[in-house]
Amino acid sequence: MSVEGKHVIVTGGASGVGAQTARQFVEAGADVTIMGRTEQSLVDQKIPYQVCDVTDREMVMKAFDAARAARGPVAVVVANAGAATSVPFARLTPKALDDMLSVNLSGVINCWQAALPDMKSAGWGRMIATASTASLRGYPYVSAYCAAKHAVVGLTRSLARELALTGITVNAICPGYVETPLLERSILNIVNKTGMSTDDASKVLMADNPQRRFVQTDEVAGTALWLCSDAARSVNGHALTLSGGEI
């Protein structure tokens, strides 16, 4: 089984991991739809797209309907859209918590539910979430983000068993820090707050990775593509870490 001719939806597809994942699926012959919140960023990728805020369930359903009408039933969903904020737990507000849960957890649920009927009808499907090492361990000052990402792994493990006889597999990819524009902004934030050099700030973030490097977007994308291959047909309910041995 290959992804050639299969309809793949990648959320958060305008940049970083999502954009790289979409490109690698296109190169593998898939019919890809990317989704994101702003049209201009999506247009730049030169891949068919739908504007969609994954936290808005009605918008998700409409976007999937439009994508389905254009490119056929959905076979693969890479739920990649996400966000993180840093705040001490004592200052975590209910709204900040809700925001983290909405994009990082509810967004995954909304997208997977939108594609589930197609996958069940086909007797084959791949539900993939871009999670994080924060799905499996704690980090300071990102308690809401860690809680949401831990929940994604719980969702993944539950659905894997629920859907095990349908031909659908459900997995989460859990990378450490990935070298993206978002990471660059995080490094700049450390520099501005501490006066560190860019190199020193980068080393702080690399410290948990025994390989002392950042994960690259093609590693995450390649893992998603592998999960759609015959070689991974028994891989179900897993949280696959890409962290150089951190976890």
Describe the residue ranges of each PLM region.
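C-terminal substrate-recognition "lid" of short-chain dehydrogenase/reductases
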Residues: Q211-L242
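Substrate-binding pocket helix/loop in short-chain dehydrogenase/reductase
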Residues: P88-F89, A96-L101, L205
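Short, small/polar-rich loop/turn modules that mediate ligand/substrate recognition or access, typified
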Residues: A164, T169, V235-G237
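Alpha-helical segment proximal to the catalytic Tyr-Lys
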Residues: P117, R161-E162, R233
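Residue(s) in the substrate-gating loop at a strand-loop-helix junction
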Residues: S132
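Active-site helix of classical SDR
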Residues: W112, A148, T156
